[in-house]
Design a protein with these regions (language model features):
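IMPase-like, lithium-sensitive Mg2+-dependent phosphomonoesterase catalytic core
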Residues: 1-167
Length: 167
């Protein structure tokens, strides 16, 4: 509608972005079903989205760096349904309460840990990685020195599930 705040929508599922109202304030980008190859093996899948300021009033507004995003987030569908959103530099998580049929705040002001014992990467792409990435992965598998601890690889092939584990 002409009163809509959404100017358009882009997704890897579409050949071209959809423009609804070129003068509206925001554009939405999404991967509606991330990890869809995991459906047949009953692994978690999700939806990834971002909301961008409509600065160019057309398709070129989709080609913007992260500083133009006013919000981003994901939904994770699995044993529990989780919705995570970043607004005003704050990451908040909600979990679906199946009895109440509403999302309840489950974590507030989430931060990515500085260190951890787990990493997530698709090792099938090892040959195409830059040398510093290869070295980092190999160092995590075979640490040297007393300060380095071995890290564990966890990768399911769903960006949403893998990123959520990191958070």
């Amino acid at each position: 509608s002409k009163n809509s705040s959404c100017a358009g929508y882009a997704s890897e599922e579409l050949v071209e972005p959809l423009i609804f109202n070129q003068s509206a304030r925001f554009m939405v980008v999404a991967d509606p079903l991330d990890g869809s190859s995991n459906i047949s093996v009953n692994m978690p899948i999700g939806t990834i989205f971002g909301i961008i300021r409509n600065t160019d009033y057309g398709v070129s507004s989709f080609n913007k760096s992260g500083r133009y995003y006013i919000s981003a987030g994901y939904s994770l569908y699995g044993p529990s349904d989780i919705f995570v959103i970043c607004v005003n530099n704050k990451v908040i998580e909600f979990t679906l309460d199946p009895e109440k049929k509403e999302y309840m705040l489950s974590r507030d002001d989430i931060k990515i840990p500085r260190t951890g014992s787990v990493y997530s990467i698709n090792e099938g792409n090892f040959v195409s990685w830059e040398d510093n990435v290869k070295k980092w992965v190999l160092d995590n598998k075979n640490p040297t020195g007393s300060s380095n601890k071995r890290k564990t690889l966890r990768y399911v092939g769903s960006l949403v599930a893998d990123a959520h584990r990191t958070l």
